[in-house]
Every structure is written in structure tokens, then in C-alpha cells.
Curated annotation (Swiss-Prot):
Induction conditions: By hydrogen peroxide.
EC number: 1.11.1.6
Cofactor: heme
Organism of this sequence: Aspergillus oryzae (strain ATCC 42149 / RIB 40) (Yellow koji mold)
Active site residues of this protein: H101, N174
Propeptide: 16-27
Protein name: Catalase B
Keyword Lipid biosynthesis included in the entry's annotation: no
Oligomeric form and interacting partners: Homotetramer.
Gene label: catB
Residues involved in heme binding: Y388
Family under the similarity heading: Belongs to the catalase family.
Length: 725
């Protein structure tokens, strides 16, 4: 259907707004169904083309398959407005991609407050138990272009918009709680360093090159975030399996003006899970859309991912209490110091209807805050408040990007901003200034006591001389990277070591590699020596200035069982030559589906009961691999000298593919198993059936399936990965 007129939309919004009826003091308790409210709002802008004739942009029916020309072979006429419109619109379809976070995927959902938190914040969306607020979330990678791989090793953006009844509130965060720099003035330097080279645009979406590690080694404030990115956090299993963080310290402010310092946390209710590096590289090559596909399919299947929102709450006097500055964005507050207070739950339950109109055009910025939330003096946050707004002028060609449907608040907008490119509304107030008498003083000023307006925390104050210098309270940038490294399991430490080795093996400058080891040695001599011996740098003596043995909790991505199995996939490797192998999948699927696990049946070719072929399958597509009974003939040890008709060789799939799926599944730490006679396939793969995470049974029994479920919850069996010592 055609979109409603903008004038009618203004009327609809005005009629529904409590502020327009004089109920300025009432605090709305929220909609009964925030999901329905999202659909109701966005559906006003839908354009459906069902059973219609093609029209021009101005509504006239047309045909556009042939240009208007002179005769059968003559030139195209300039008067062909249909041709000109079609080509011109095509030429201008793209907008400039984001300078960072260009590659992203989004979803709608709802946030439900666990209670009334007016004792800590005046924010309306946290003002009542059960109150629902529509949300939109965009996940992203940072460095790559819009067409880059989802599985590039990177920090992942986790930006959330709350469409509250007092305006839009954005938490523009990441899946890592700290950032590379302390001062926003360094942001162009950071991004120029990690982006591809200026002369050849290589490498794409990667930091395994000289300029990135040159910057990291010259700007040691980056070390903390760097170690997080080199761990499993840089290559998550899916976006459903990441936590999120607001990075900065913010303020909560009550109606009375009392303020607290807070840090925002999103905790995945699926649990955390990550890939290993070679697995992620293979995914990048085989399916660069892996992350967005996983999120989209989970929501389409009704397996809605969920996160809990929590905050660490600190007194204003605690700014330097913990041995570091709470306004330093390269620091975490360990949860042993300040536990997380849970505020509510977010459920993502609706995919966008149009990627460009919603996910690409959405603009988040830290300056989207509401009454009850306030900023701090964090210098990175202060700079982001300008940058995120400014960049949208370039992307959208004017200041009216807030009027796009995905960016519009769900409450009416009344101010004196006017005109600009792409103005979508028709303002009726001719007196666009304040104060005025000609429009009876409207729109009126709203503040802490009148109109439920935004207000700055009354206690904020700042004095001092002008200076360009790093605060002494920001200077220790090595203790917390060590805290992170100390807190990882030995296998996770090995993954970090291996990742830094890989990255620096691609660094050509020996000077840069030496500088990297100098900085790593200030964090950990163990880490520095293990990396140095692999990249041609002399192993250093300890530099213990910042060494300590402290540890914290919940910073890794391995070692904790998953909370849900929703959307995980088990590859069931069968053969069309043995129908019983395909039939065995039904019982497995029946039992695993109770936990939301999908069984994908793989065979030589498509037929009834077969989901995909060996030619299109790899271990990277599955979270567990099981060989079906009767299919073991496909898993004989591959040999190039074997007869051409050997069962391990076929024109239907690459040589040795079935056996390789089993081998890769095991070496990537996944649960693997076999039913009945198929146990020989594990033997051919060199897998001992006594190992943890290996499951064998005569049939698909409940005990066998329970073992697979437990293996999926473990997700990665870390004893399969070799340690340096």
C-alpha cells in the first residue's frame, strides 16, 4: 500500500501524544505490545507492489524495458524521461558507507524493564516493572568495508536504540568493554592505521599489517582492547553469542538531581561462544555472510535471541577509588569490585523488511540520551558526541536524517529547526524562534521541573587550566591488559599468543615487530617471549614494573557452558546409497529439536530427507558432526593412488570431503560422534573414541543424544589445542 501522507502522520502522532493533551506530568507505563507498536509505526511507510502497474516516481503508469529511440536502430532520444529517471535513480542509489562499522546487520525487538528504578534514574523506560520499549539493534565489524567478511577478526559493534516515550536513547557500544584510545582526537590516527594501505587498498578488514601494529606499539593505550580482540571476542560464533558494553562511564540522574556513575552491560542469555582462527578464516572464504545469516534465520525461526541489560553503579566520589580513572575508556571495573545490577531484558524478535531503509540508514549516536541519563568527562565520549552526529551529514547529504522512519522517535518532535535538504515535514508554526508571543510561547522550554525535560546532573562541575596533556590518572595502560591475560584459561592464552603471532608474521618491518615485543613485555614476559620466538625477535628479559598476579572473572569466551542451544546445527553425515543412514536422522532431529537444535542431513546428492550435499558442506557450518550408520564407506582414508572407483573418491564432491569434515570438526574443538558401524569413520580420521567430546553408540539412544547436547553446551573442547608449555 502507499505510504500515508506526512501531514496525516503528524496528526496521528499528535493525537496519541500525552504531551499534546496537557498531561505533562504523567509517566506512560508503556505499550502492552511493543512489537506490535513497531509494526504499526513502520507499516505507515511500507510500499507494496502487489497486483499493480509500474509507475514513474510521480505516479504515472509506464513501461521501462526499452528506451525511446528513432526507428529500429536509431539513437535514444533525450526526451525519454522514463530512461532518464530510471538511470538517474540507479546512479544515486548508494550513499557513502560509514567510515567505520560499515559492515552491519540489524534487528528489531523489545526491552522489558525488571522493575521501577526511579531511585537511581529518571529515565522513563526504566520506570515501571514490565514496561516495554521498542528497540533496534545494529551489530557490526569496525574496520572492514560494507562488503567485507563477517568473520574478520575485529571488535564488533553492538549499538542499541530504545524508542522511549521520552525520545530516543542510544547505547552505542561494542562487544568489548574497552577501546583503543583515551582521547577522541586520536580516532583518525587509529582508523587510518588499521584501514587498508593507501597505495593498494590492502588488506581488507584486517590488522595483520605494518601500519596497524606500528600504531598499537606506539600507542600502548590500545593494548587492552587489542588483547580482547586477539582472543575469542574478535571471532565470535555468532552475534547471538556476544555480550555488549557501553564502554564509557555515564551518569544516572534521579528526578531529585541525585547522580550515580554507571557502566552499561549486555549479557547474552544464549551464553558466549567463539570460533578458533582457522575455522573463522574458512568461514570468511566459504560464507562471508555467516553472522547476518545466523541472526536472520534464528529470528525467522522464532528463536529470539535475548540479552539482559545491567549496570555497575558507583558513587561520584568513586572516580579514582579503584586505582584507575573511571573516565578512562581503556579500563574495566572488575565485577568483584562492583557487581552488575540487572535492569531488564531485551528480545530481538523481528527482522528488518528492507535492509537499506532500516539497517543502512539507521544512525546511532551517543548524544541520543534521555532525561535521567547524563554524560561524563570521558574525553573519548566527549569527542564521539560530535563525530557521530557530524558523519551523518556526509552520509545523508543534509541535517534531516532524524526524520527517516528508522530514526524517528515514537513521540512527536517540536522545535525551531527548519528546512535543509530532504525536509519531510510541513511545519505549521511560522514563528520559528524562542521566546515568542505570536505562537503563545510554543514550543515551550522544558527542564527538570517543567515539562519533564532533559537536565544535566546538578552536581557536575569542572575547574582547571587549559592543557593538552594526558591525565596522570590515565597513564597506567599496562596493568589492565595483564589483568585480562592473567584471567584467561591456558588454552585462551594460547589463542591470544597464536593470534598475535599470525598478525605479526605479516608485519614486514623488524622495527615494528621489536616495538610490539617491548610493549607486550610490559604486560607479560610470558606473552612477549612466546610471541617473540615465532616472529624473529629476541626474547626479552622481564620488565616487571606493571606485573601483578591479579585475576578477574567472566572475561573469556571459553570454559563456560552455553545457556541455550537455540539455532545450533548438527551435521549428520549420511549416504543416499544407504537409506537407513538418512532415516536415522529423524530420531536424532526429534530429540535435539526440543532444545532448538537443527539437524542438517548431508549426503552425496539431494534427495528426500537430504538437506545439503557434501560438495557444499564443511565442518565450519556445523556446531557438531555425527556420522550416520551405514555411511562409513564414504569415510575411508583418502589416497591419491587409490583406484578411481574407491568410495572415498567421487565426482559428486571434492576428494576426501566427507572424512575432512570429521577431521576438521574434531580439530576445531567441536563435538563429534558416530552411530553403529560408522565408528570406523572416527578411526579413519585418527580420533580416539575415549576423548572428551567424542560420542559413539550403537543407535540414536537418549543417552547418546544427551551426550551430544552436553557437548554442544561445552561448545569447544579445549584439550584438543596444543599449548606452548
Amino acid at each position: 500500500m502507499r505510504a500515508l501522507s506526512l501531514a496525516s502522520l503528524i496528526g496521528i502522532a499528535s493525537a496519541a501524544c500525552p504531551y499534546m493533551t496537557g498531561e505533562l506530568e504523567r509517566r506512560d507505563t508503556g505499550t502492552d505490545d511493543a512489537t506490535a507498536a513497531t509494526e504499526e509505526f513502520l507499516s505507515q511507510y511500507y510500499m507494496a507492489d502487489n497486483d499493480t502497474f509500474l509507475t514513474s516516481d510521480v505516479g504515472g503508469p509506464i513501461e521501462d524495458q526499452n528506451s525511446l529511440q528513432v526507428g529500429d536502430r536509431g539513437p535514444t532520444l533525450l526526451e525519454d524521461f522514463i530512461f532518464r529517471q530510471k538511470i538517474q535513480r540507479f546512479d544515486h542509489e548508494r550513499v557513502p558507507e560509514r567510515a567505520v562499522h560499515a559492515r552491519g546487520v540489524g534487528a528489531h525487538g523489545v526491552f522489558t524493564s525488571y522493575g521501577d528504578y526511579s531511585n537511581i534514574t529518571a529515565a522513563s523506560f526504566l520506570g515501571a516493572e514490565g514496561k516495554e520499549t521498542p528497540v533496534f539493534v545494529r551489530f557490526s565489524t569496525v574496520a572492514g568495508s560494507r562488503g567485507s567478511s563477517d568473520l574478520a577478526r575485529d571488535v564488533h559493534g553492538f549499538a542499541t536504540r530504545f524508542y522511549t516515550d521520552e525520545g530516543n536513547f542510544d547505547i552505542v557500544g561494542n562487544n568489548i568493554p574497552v577501546f583503543f584510545i583515551q582521547d577522541a582526537i586520536l580516532f583518525p590516527d587509529l582508523i587510518h592505521a588499521v584501514k587498508p594501505r593507501g597505495d593498494n587498498e590492502i588488506p581488507q578488514a584486517a590488522t595483520a599489517h605494518d601500519s596497524a601494529w606500528d600504531f598499537f606499539s606506539q600507542q600502548p593505550s590500545s593494548l587492552h582492547t587489542l588483547l580482547w580482540a586477539m582472543s575469542g571476542h574478535g571471532i565470535p560464533r555468532s552475534l547471538r553469542h556476544v555480550d555488549g558494553f557501553g564502554i564509557h562511564t555515564f551518569r544516572f540522574v534521579t528526578d531529585n538531581g541525585d547522580s550515580k556513575l554507571v557502566k552499561f552491560h549486555w549479557k547474552s542469555l544464549q551464553g558466549k561462544a567463539s570460533m578458533v582462527w582457522e575455522e573463522a578464516q574458512q568461514v570468511s572464504g566459504k560464507n562471508p555472510d555467516f553472522m547476518r545469516q545466523d541472526l536472520f534465520e534464528a529470528i525467522e525461526a522464532g528463536r529470539y535471541p535475548e540479552w539482559e541489560l545491567g549496570v555497575q553503579i558507583m558513587d561520584e566520589e568513586d572516580q579514582l577509588k579503584f586505582g584507575f580513572d573511571l573516565f578512562d575508556p581503556t579500563k574495566i571495573v572488575p565485577e568483584e569490585y562492583v557487581p552488575i545490577t540487572k535492569l531488564g531484558k531485551m528480545t530481538l524478535n523481528r527482522n528488518p523488511r528492507n535492509y537499506f531503509a532500516e539497517t543502512e540508514q539507521v544512525m546511532f549516536q551517543p548524544g541520543h540520551i534521555v532525561r535521567g541519563v547524563d554524560f561524563t568527562e570521558d574525553p573519548l565520549l566527549q569527542g564521539r558526541l560530535f563525530s557521530y552526529l557530524d558523519t551523518q551529514l556526509n552520509r545523508h547529504g543534509g541535517p534531516n536524517f532524524e526524520q527517516l522512519p528508522i530514526n524517528q522517535p515514537r513521540v512527536p518532535v517540536h522545535n525551531n529547526n527548519r528546512d535543509g535538504a530532504g525536509q519531510m515535514f510541513i511545519p505549521l508554526n511560522p514563528n520559528a524562534y524562542s521566546p515568542n508571543t505570536l505562537n503563545k510561547g510554543s514550543p515551550k522550554q522544558a527542564n527538570q521541573t517543567v515539562g519533564k525535560g532533559f537536565f544535566t546532573a546538578p552536581g557536575r562541575e569542572s575547574t582547571g587550566r587549559f592543557t593538552r596533556a594526558v591525565s596522570p590518572s590515565f597513564e597506567d595502560v599496562w596493568s589492565q591488559p595483564r589483568l585480562f591475560y592473567n584471567s584467561l584459561t591456558p588454552a585462551e592464552q594460547q589463542f591470544v599468543v597464536d593470534a598475535i603471532r599470525f598478525e605479526n608474521s605479516n608485519v614486514k618491518s623488524s622495527v615494528v615487530r621489536n616495538n610490539v615485543i617491548i610493549q607486550l613485555n610490559r604486560v607479560s614476559n610470558d606473552l612477549a617471549r612466546r610471541v617473540a620466538r615465532a616472529i624473529g625477535v629476541e626474547e626479552p628479559e622481564a620488565d616487571p614494573t606493571y606485573y601483578h598476579n591479579n585475576k578477574t572473572t567472566d572475561v573469556g569466551t571459553f570454559g563456560q557452558k552455553l545457556k541455550k542451544l537455540d539455532g545450533l546445527k548438527v551435521g549428520f553425515l549420511a549416504s543416499v546409497e544407504t537409506p537407513a543412514s538418512i532415516e536415522a536422522a529423524s530420531e536424532l532431529s526429534k530429540q535435539l529439536s526440543e532444545d532448538g537444535v537443527d539437524v542438517v542431513v548431508v549426503a552425496e546428492r539431494l534427495s528426500d530427507g537430504v538437506d545439503q550435499t557434501y560438495s557444499g558442506s564443511d565442518a565450519i557450518q556445523f556446531d557438531a558432526v555425527i556420522v550416520a550408520p551405514g555411511a562409513e564407506g564414504l569415510f575411508s582414508t583418502f589416497s591419491f593412488t587409490a583406484p578411481s572407483n574407491a568410495t572415498s573418491s567421487s565426482t559428486l564432491f571434492p576428494a576426501g570431503r566427507p572424512l575432512q569434515i570429521v577431521i576438521d570438526g574434531f580439530r576445531f574443538g567441536k563435538p563429534v560422534g558416530a552411530v553403529g558401524s560408522a565408528a570406523t569413520a572416527l578411526k579413519n580420521a585418527g580420533i580416539q573414541t575415549s576423548r572428551d567430546g567424542v560420542y559413539v553408540d550403537k543407535s540414536v539412544t537418549s543417552g547418546f543424544v544427551d551426550g551430544i547436547k552436553d557437548g554442544l553446551r561445552t561448545f569447544k573442547f579445549l584439550d584438543r589445542f596444543k599449548l606452548d608449555h
